[in-house]
Amino acid sequence: MNKGFDTLLEYSFIHIPGIKEKTEKKIWEMGILTWDDMQENILNPEIPVYNRDLVKSYIIGSKRALENVNIGFFRENFPKKEYWRIYPKFKERTLFLDVETNGLAKELNEITVIGTLYKGKFRSFINGINLHDVIPLIEDCLIIVTYNGNLFDIPYIERTFNIWKKNYISLDLRWIFKRLGYSGGLKSIEKQLGINRPDYLKDVNGYTAVLLWEKYQSRRLNALNVLRRYCLEDVKNLVFLLHIAYNRLCKELRFPQKIKPLSEKFKWEIKINCDFSIIDEIQMEVKN
């Protein structure tokens, strides 16, 4: 009956009206695991659904949306807390993103650097140089992954570029990890999971990023490269965290069949020439 799939999306029924978590699990326990299974067995009176025509139409719509890369269908119909299921199927159009700002009061606070990973390529976008070049990536992507981005990164991007992109899915890892029982900022979550940053970046935080931008503004050009490197470390670790979260949430579902786990190991190298001694300089200034 079941052909088997690498990702959880095609096993999901939770986006169909009338099917909640308990009902979805009952359906799985009956051996109805995929959209195809449901189509083939829709007349089975033991399947705990009430409107079979509605279920059938949603199965057909789901297949069509997947074939046509229509992320809007899944965005509108999946519960937000289940958006994580969608990621692997649209991985190639997923934008990992981190925003740094100048740290001023709200009306004066503006983006300084945006770091991204998209289609396997790390990039930096810098205020006063190429900041607006990030727009094509935002317009092309189908999923945006951030940490606390729903409250911070995305509002700043919308305000800065006057982009009100609606047809995408936002995966904010802060709330995904809260569901898994973790709390704290990005660096705190990394430490709790045993993700280690390079020694030269271990003591760098958001406040250091603000001071690096100030150094750059005072013509310390190396400070910009250090800031870019720090920002892209945030971006890189978003991928680790999302894959860890996906694998753990899959296990929590207790799905009857093993879902292929996402890789939690990467060998990325972020190539930016930096003199990290400026970090020690900043830390000494802060202490004094």
What are these regions (language model features)?
Residues 1-110, 116-288:
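DEDD superfamily 3′-5′ metal-dependent exonuclease/proofreading module
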